[in-house]
A protein has these predicted regions:
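Short alpha-helix in the alpha/beta-hydrolase fold that links the catalytic acid
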Residues: 91-99
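Short beta-strand/loop motif that positions the catalytic acidic residue
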Residues: 75, 80-83, 87
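Gly/Ala-rich beta-loop-alpha elbow adjacent to hydrolase catalytic centers
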Residues: 35-43
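Short beta-strand immediately N-terminal to the catalytic nucleophile in serine-hydrolase-like folds
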Residues: 33-35, 63
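A conserved short beta-strand
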Residues: 53-67
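Serine-hydrolase catalytic machinery in alpha/beta-hydrolase-like enzymes
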Residues: 1-30
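Post-His helix in hydrolase/transferase enzymes
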Residues: 117-132
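Acidic catalytic loop of the alpha/beta-hydrolase fold
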Residues: 85-90, 114-115
Length: 142
């Protein structure tokens, strides 16, 4: 998933843009990438290629990273890595083992499974806090 972010951003009027205006608009906005599960694997390699071309995205978010299923590439130190405590598809220990040599912080959502049922608000809150430079709680039960 690729998105462009602008703070604050309004979708009002986007439908009115013609095809020629859109590329110019997105060139002016910072690039953010996010991947969930297999998408985190894909995102890691897209970021690697973009970085080699000096076009690295400003932000990378990896949720439920599929580190035990695929060889996920190393990522920038400021990557937001979020994983569920009770993920039965990708064990938390696999993500921690992948993150440890990179000295990445892994945000663990207590009680969350691989699909973060009833925990999506926690993902949102972690990302919003990180993007606004606010500290993230070590353990938050919602």
């Amino acid at each position: 998933v690729i998105a462009w972010m602008k703070d604050p951003f309004s979708w009002q009027g986007i439908k009115e843009l013609d095809g020629h205006a859109w590329p110019q608009l997105v060139e002016e906005l910072p690039l953010a990438m996010a991947g969930f599960s297999f998408g985190s694997y894909v995102s890691s390699y897209v970021v690697k290629e973009l970085t080699e071309k000096n076009e690295a995205p400003e932000r990378l978010i990896m949720v439920g990273s599929a580190t035990s299923k695929w060889d996920v590439a190393p990522v920038p130190k400021d990557t937001i890595v979020i994983h569920g405590e009770v993920d039965d598809v990708i064990p938390l220990t696999s993500v921690l083992d992948w993150a440890r040599p990179q000295e990445l912080t892994v945000q663990v959502i207590p009680g969350a499974d691989h699909f973060f049922h009833r925990k999506l608000h926690c993902i949102r809150d972690l990302i919003v806090r990180a993007w606004h430079g606010q500290p993230t709680p070590v353990n938050e039960n919602k």
